[in-house]
Each structure stands twice: as C-alpha cells, then as structure tokens.
Amino acid sequence: MRDAANKQIEIPYLLKIGNGKTERVGKYLFDKRFLRIALYMGDGIVELIGGTLKAGLAECGIETVREHIAASVEIDEITHSAFSLPAVDAIVGVGGGKALDFAKYTAHLLRIPFISIPTAISNDGFGSSSASLTILGKRKSVKAASPFGIVIDLDVIKNSPDIFMYSGIGDMLSKITALDDWQAARDRGFERYVDFSAMMAYNSLDILFLKHSYNIRSESFQRSLASSLTVSGLAMEIAGSSRPASGSEHLISHALDEICEKPKMHGIQVGVATYTEINF
C-alpha cells in the first residue's frame, strides 16, 4: 500500500438513494456518458425489475453490449467473461452478492467504472471494493473495483423479505466489535489505524441507530439502513482495508460457514457473533 499521505481514495461519483430510481438508471448513465454497458444480473432480477430497467436504458439510448445472469462467482469464469467482452464504458451489476461481485471484479480486471445497483440491503458489500469469489473450490475475498456509482431504489428494497433487513442490521452491528478490535490491534502496534476512516464507521452506526423509529418496514428506516451501509463501505475504502467493518465477529461467521451444513445469511451470523462477544 502506498504511503497514507499519497493514497488515492475512490468515492462514488454517482450516489442515488430513493424511490423510482430503477427507471432513471438510463438517465444517470447517459449523464456520465456511459453509452455502452455490460449488464450483470442475479437470478430472478429480470422478472423483478428487468423490464423497468431495460426500458429506461433504451429510452436514453444506452446500448447493452452484453447481458449476463451471474449464477456463480468462479474466478475462472469471470476472468474468461471479462477478457472476451467487447469495449464498454461501464459495468453495471444488479441484484445481490453474486451479481455485484461478478460485476465489480470484471470492472477491476478491465479497469473501467462499476455501477452497483443492489436489490437488497443485507450487508455493506454493495459499496465496498472487495468481492467474494470461488477460487480453487473455496470462497475468498479479493480486491475488486470500488463503485463509481451506487443506485438504491427504495421501491425495490421495500419488497425484500424481513430476513434481508435483519441481515443488514446485523452487518451494521458488527462494526461495534470490528472497531474495538481495530483499536486493540493499533494499541499493540500490529496495525495502522486511520482516524478518519474510524470516524466514518462510527458515523455509519449513528445514521442507523440514533433514530426514533425502528420499524424495519418504514421507508425512513430503510433509507437510513441503506445510507449507513453505504458509509460503511466508504470507511473501508478510506482505510484501504476491511478493518473498520470486519473484526473477530467476521472470523466467527467464516468458521460457521465452514462447519454448518446450512449457514445463515452473512449479516445474521456476524450480528449474532457481535452480540455474543459484547455479552461474553
């Protein structure tokens, strides 16, 4: 990593959180002169919002050079797909973890802008510069593209199951122990600590938890959850690592992934691990 004084920080130039955003994706891309794109979507996304999304793209004259359903995150498949892709201005990922990881790693390989359009807010991965890929049969976290743009349509988010909301809350809770672990590592001289990044991570907690209402079905809460997860992703980009958002609670979750026949959602596991650590 370069010296902190010379570190280049990539932040989203395009950030839209609100209602009716899917139909405006075409306009957002046109405004940035991203006229040729590759579109990577998760299973079921075409049926969920595909019609609205494609209509908006066509209306603005955006050409979709490739449309791909990302059913896996095998690194060999992504690499082959990336280097067989005709020239495009941007990579657009729509859906959950697999689609976004497929898209952001493709953008990383080709060094072109990545637009992240999550259809659920179950963790902060949609705003981070890391991807969870399958390498030699095992899931590993690798460096990927930081989002040039993030578009979150609350009209889509509100239709996701409750478990996705709880997972997002759990992922946010994990910042509590992650930040404590980071400070402990700093105090023992093991790791570099970035004050501004830590402040951003603490602020991401404040956005969500300093609220008067915790009704997960309210638009206000969902907007706050989306915003806090976005800020958490930015905190990681500033730090140059996942330390502001990932600590020992994530190691517990990774262990559960290995030993459980049917692991739960990532945010659920890290949330439970955080609660256990706090009360240990």
PLM region spans:
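Active-site segments that bind and position negatively charged phosphate/pyrophosphate groups
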Residues: 198-280
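Solvent-exposed alpha-helices and their adjacent loops that cap or buttress functional pockets
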Residues: 7-8, 32, 83-86, 107, ...
